[in-house]
Amino acid sequence: MGKEKTHINLVVIGHVDSGKSTTTGHLIYKLGGIDKRTIEKFEKESSEMGKGSFKYAWVLDKLKAERERGITIDIALWQFETPKYHYTVIDAPGHRDFIKNMITGTSQADVALLVVPADRFEGAFSKEGQTREHALLAFTLGVRQMIVGINKMDTCEYKQSRFDEIFNEVDGYLKKVGYNTEKIPFVAISGFVGDNMVERSDKMPWYKGKTLVEALDTMEPPKRPTDKPLRLPLQDVYKIGGVGTVPVGRVETGIIRPGMNVTFAPAGVTTEVKSVEMHHEQMPEAVPGDNVGFNVKNVSIKDIKRGFVASDAKNDPAKGCEDFTAQVIVLNHPGEIKNGYSPVVDCHTAHISCKFQTITAKMDKRSGKVLEENPKLIKSGDAALVVMQPLKPLCVEAFTDYPPLGRFAVRDMKQTVAVGVIKSVTKKEATSKKK
């Protein structure tokens, strides 16, 4: 796979039965970094298990199992190339914490592929189905580019009437959420049979649109914020024998280089970067979008952990916060949310309880106009301005300064009850600890 193509991160969203896994598996299978030997091995195993029909989803299941078992993910397995771009699938659907991952992970997505099934569309698109929630989330979290794959066209005899019906429904909803649907390709596909995935299908002469691969090639490459100061939320911290402490994470903004002094917030620990590695290769620098491990001097694995943020000690270093003000949209909370409510907030890689200190205003979701000052309570469907206080040290940023560190999910009762975008942050003046 060539190094010269622009990289784009793709998140695949949609209901459980939409055929996301098969569709994603098909792309990776046809265009991806899985070598023929591995594919033959998977095919042999899947036919031995009588799963021959599921070979694309099977590819994905095997990858998922490997991803869940092992620490090191062979990222190449999750990549595929279109004529124009190099795509990485950054979250495989069907994961228990998918919505949480979408928020902490969608910060990483440049494009969302929304897969809707032609066979059981009504169920997937009902109030209870996840399709609407995923689309709203993608928009709230700043993913502005989308492709809609109307999948399983083989189950409705490739009928135009069915495509049109689903198109109208999804198009209407996406407009309501805030998407400019003129720019969204709607593609008629079968991830299982392969229609309009890579090659144009001859079964839908009425369909004048693009294949999925052509649609992927019409997306705009992301503008990577290299000119902003460094922000790198830690996904994990490893202790590697003979090397030392190695934090791992994705560069969100700025650049990280060996020799640089980095500060980890909220702890205020500062140290020197010895080396930066990606896919087991040393790099002279890493830029936004790169998933890297970097080796740091004299820092114990006890000093830093997942959810901390690495930043340049000499250029707007990150700090912990006293509190932050956010616009919060309540998605599905069974009751009423009042001042004092203290759910878990997932922001970038951090997972910390935060208190709704003051709900200062209820607002209109679309226009942002204030509807009511200091409301007594908010409930599902409401948008509000809330001052939030972390109950443990936390580093977040305003969405306008550092977008990936300025959006979050509110989790309670094992589900995402709200999402938020941070307007402003009261920072703690850190007492720095030099290492």
Curated annotation (Swiss-Prot):
Region of interest: G1: 14-21
Location of the tr-type G domain: 5-226
G4 as annotated region, ranges: 151-154
GO molecular function, one term: GTP binding
Entry's family note: Belongs to the TRAFAC class translation factor GTPase superfamily. Classic translation factor GTPase family. EF-Tu/EF-1A subfamily.
Record NCBIfam families: EF-1_alpha (TIGR00483), PRK12317.1 (NF008969)
Protein name: Elongation factor 1-alpha
Organism of origin: Cryptosporidium parvum
